[in-house]
Curated annotation (Swiss-Prot):
Gene3D superfamilies: FAD/NAD(P)-binding domain. It catalyses: griseophenone C + FADH2 + chloride + O2 = griseophenone B + FAD + 2 H2O + H(+). The keyword Transmembrane helix does not apply. This is Flavin-dependent halogenase gsfI. One of its GO terms (biological process) is griseofulvin biosynthetic process. The keyword Flavoprotein applies. It comes from Penicillium aethiopicum. Pfam families: FAD_binding_3. Belongs to the flavin-dependent halogenase family.
Amino acid sequence: MAIPQSCTVLVAGGGPGGSYTAAALAREGVDVVLLEADCHPRYHIGESLLPSMRYLLRFIDLEDTFEQHGFQKKLGAFFKLNAKSAGYTDFIRANGPNGYSWNVVRSESDEILFRHATKSGAKTFENVSLKSVNFEPYENDKFTSQDKLTNPGRPVSAEWKTKDGCSGTISFDYLVDATGRVGILSTKYLKNRKFNESFRNIAMWGYFKGNIPPSPGTDRENQPISEGMRDGSGWVWMLPLHNGTVSIGAVVRKDIFQAKKKALPEGTTEAQTLASLVALCPTISSYLEPAELASGIRQAADYSYSANAYAGPNFRIVGDAGCFIDPFFSSGHHLALSSALAAATSINACIRGDCNEFDASRWFAKKVDEGYTLFLVVVMAALKQIRMQEQPILSDLDEEGFDRAFTILRPVIQGAADKETAPKAKGESITETIDLCLTALNDLHDTELQRKLTSIVEAKGTPEQEQLLGKLSPDETAALHRMRAMHSILPMGELEDFENSNIDGFKARLEKGSLGLRRERALCRDHAGDLQM
């Protein structure tokens, strides 16, 4: 099949985010073209999934396919931050006997998603790269960074090129950038990618066979573990896969990694370098004593980044194309697929006439930004504990481990609220998570800041409130915005949680055949985190 000259929605990138977006829209009868630069199956890292994947896959009728494929069941996960005992997040206890997720071989799981987009009705093409995008002026001054939007014009066509040298142009009504870290819109046109200096890391990994399974002889046997290095320089993952191997990888700050490599004897191999990093994690090292390396060693930059805009007139940016977080809590797939569902929802809302383009793109951009912000603050708190090994960041001095902390963090790091949690308690649960992390990051330890925020809350709805807001420093204003973003989120669990999220008076309508947005009364809450500024 030849690449058509036009379509309603062009999706660039056939990874999880792009394939999911294409499948969700095609199931609504939308004319979708999906271009993938490589050919499936192709290798990719990022093999651990959260329980929220089940609900996302179920919406496009793909849950059973993943279930039947034979991927390694992920019943929970261990997190060992320092010398104290590991914390464990139990998916089964929280979500029931079928509440587990999977560790996946990405070449297999990504291909399943891509082929499903084809079966759903999308026109899919492999070995085709998006080379450039053409824009037309779009006269609307509402698209501002305050709403995580921008207006470079409306994209109307793009040039593509195949690996064998063929090229052409395709026109479209909407564009979805799912090009991963390439992020063609953010890096080439918007130029708005911003790296988090705290997370300029290097990742090094390989695959082993013959290891001792984690927590042998228990109901938690062979579940993944992430362990902080004893010198605080990074962390190591151990992730069992269904093909009989275990994925072992180290994530280290770039400057420290370079110093460690320089200090190693001349002639040190990549495998020996990885072994020297794993040796800083006693628990994982003990499980690997009888294991043998079964692959080459891979290395990549593991820089966390975000942007000041994730959407604009008739375009959406999903997954890693827009933002990326250190993978300590396996957030990648969750953020990719939840943003993909949000992209499909907002685009189809415009096609159906549920709302205008500005409202749809603003809803999408805020949805993406809020999910990213919540995971970011949780990861930052955990990594701060790793880097400050003996300081009581996520536990009290007299606590033996981190079970209390990980019970509080569970709604975020499982990507879902517990099934047994009542709707009202979900908000309390996420607030407790945020409070723990903000305390760990010292964001609210400043009593002067607390006093100012309290004054703003008490003055809500009065002229004095505007005066108080005007007296905040840039850092204090940023803290207030962070609170506003985080306190407005419920964790993404079952699809009704996604639907019930009210953003600027719009909620998602997740019904096959009528996917889109429905207008609701805008929320008005009573704490400083939700003040409209």
